[in-house]
Design a protein with these regions (language model features):
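Lipid interaction determinants
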Residues: 3, 12, 20-155
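Sec-dependent N-terminal signal peptides
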Residues: 8-15
């Protein structure tokens, strides 16, 4: 094999590896894509304190969470709106992992009672993990602070 043929072979191998790597989806990106582009409605807030129990959301359509493909989250919090960044890091098959939200900016309209909007906005800053199961999204708060249950929003 001549030097020119070895050079062509080496260039072909390098080019093939580069193209293959560019087409491959890293695990972190693929899991983020499981959340990216999805929308959810809040149905319940489960407290780890038995005295508080579970708070059911009367109208789930008034509390929505949308994960954008750009790493931004959009929220409807009763009569308010919010947005902020998010970062998902998968564990295992991607149906669970760590999830954190950046600062959430919200409008400040005074919603009618019960006032869950402020609680949800505040608690999103304490989310540490997620679980996708049976068309539901569970967000766990740090220090056993509770679990938010969301159902997939109809398209």
């Amino acid at each position: 094999m001549s030097a020119m043929q070895r050079l062509r072979l080496a260039c072909s191998v390098i080019l093939s590896v580069a193209i293959g790597s560019a087409c491959a989806t890293p695990a972190d990106r693929s899991v983020s894509l499981k959340l990216a582009g999805t929308s959810w409605q809040l149905v319940a807030i489960q407290s780890m304190d038995d005295a508080q129990g579970t708070t059911r959301v009367a109208d789930p359509a008034r509390f929505t969470l949308r994960f954008g493909v750009d790493g931004r989250a959009g929220l409807r919090l009763d009569c308010n709106r919010g947005s902020g960044s998010y970062e998902a890091r998968p564990a295992g098959d991607g149906s669970s992992g760590s999830l954190t939200f950046g600062a959430i900016a919200t409008t400040r309209a005074l919603c009618p009672p019960p006032h869950l909007d402020e609680r949800v906005a505040r608690d999103l800053g304490h989310v540490r993990s997620y679980l996708l199961k049976d068309g539901r999204l569970f967000l766990s708060l740090m220090a056993d602070g509770g679990i938010y249950e969301w159902h997939r929003q109809p398209d």
